[in-house]
């Protein structure tokens, strides 16, 4: 089986971030914490982001050292293996403070990896 291209992993990350934004648009932290279906969906998207980041070539990640790639993978591992201990306020804060800048970078990477082919 052949390895997927970096451009596909970047696209996966982009789509997962867009899904998180969609799932959390127009709600408060309290709304989020009370809606199990919504926060479960968000957590799943973060798991997908972490998996895709883990599959990106190191050469791609080295071009964007301002992104905490290892932290993204570590967060995925926390969500996957410590599900019952997940602090939804931390998830919410990451959505509000870290995800927008990651999204901007992913859009740039997407344009670059798409134009390479």
Predicted regions: what is each one?
Residues 1-117:
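Solvent-exposed interaction patches of small proteins and small membrane subunits
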């Amino acid at each position: 089986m052949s390895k997927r291209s970096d451009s596909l992993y970047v696209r996966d990350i982009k789509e997962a971030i867009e899904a998180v934004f969609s799932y959390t648009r127009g709600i408060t932290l309290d709304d989020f914490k009370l809606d199990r279906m919504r926060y479960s969906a968000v957590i799943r998207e973060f798991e997908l982001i972490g998996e895709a980041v883990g599959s990106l070539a190191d050469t791609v990640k080295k071009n964007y050292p301002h992104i905490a790639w290892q932290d993204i993978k570590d967060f995925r591992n926390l969500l996957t293996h410590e599900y019952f201990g997940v602090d939804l306020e931390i998830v919410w804060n990451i959505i509000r403070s870290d995800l927008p800048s990651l999204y901007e970078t992913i859009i740039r990477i997407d344009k670059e990896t798409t134009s390479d082919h």
